[in-house]
């Protein structure tokens, strides 16, 4: 009977750990997507700096895979999101430096999240092994009682 309670406890903890791991995996995916978006913005600004034309033509996305043609009127400055719905105008150089910092922050958050996920996965494996041992004990005691 004690083995049943212990097995229930281990199974419950395993479910909790699995749920936490799933949340961290989703977090990791969101962090990676956000980092990729910031990286794309940085690369776009770097490429803009290489263009010699003072007012290069661009395509402006308007949704549903549709675009309007436009011209950049100020290719020396960019308006960059700084979070919480705020954006500031920065020179391209400053914007790129700022985006580099954001990418480093994402790298660190991804690293920490991956470490936490690895720990949870290790704990889940330990719990699965423990549950299997309890089940084996139950099977052995059942055979002995016969």
Swiss-Prot record:
Pfam families xref list: Prefoldin (PF02996)
Organism, as annotated: Pyrococcus furiosus (strain ATCC 43587 / DSM 3638 / JCM 8422 / Vc1)
Gene that this polypeptide is encoded by: pfdA
Oligomer status and interactors: Heterohexamer of two alpha and four beta subunits.
GO cellular-component term (any): cytoplasm
Subcellular location, record wording: Cytoplasm
Gene Ontology BP term (one): protein folding
Record-linked NCBIfam families: prefoldin subunit alpha (TIGR00293)
Descriptive protein name: Prefoldin subunit alpha
Keywords: Chaperone, Cytoplasm
GO molecular function terms attached to this record: unfolded protein binding
UniProt main location, coarse: cytoplasm
């Amino acid at each position: 009977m004690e083995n049943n309670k212990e097995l229930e406890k281990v199974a419950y903890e395993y479910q909790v750990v699995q749920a936490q791991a799933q949340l961290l995996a989703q977090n990791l995916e969101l962090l990676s997507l956000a980092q990729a978006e910031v990286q794309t913005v940085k690369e776009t600004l770097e490429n803009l700096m290489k263009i010699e034309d003072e007012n290069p033509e661009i395509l402006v996305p308007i949704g549903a895979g549709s675009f309007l043609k436009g011209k950049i009127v100020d290719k020396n400055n960019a308006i960059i999101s700084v979070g919480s719905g705020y954006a500031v105008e920065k020179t391209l150089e400053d914007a790129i430096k700022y985006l580099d910092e954001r990418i480093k922050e994402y790298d660190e958050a991804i690293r920490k999240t991956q470490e936490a996920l690895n720990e949870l996965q290790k704990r889940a494996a330990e719990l699965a092994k423990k549950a299997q041992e309890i089940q084996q004990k139950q099977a052995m005691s059942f055979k002995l009682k016969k």
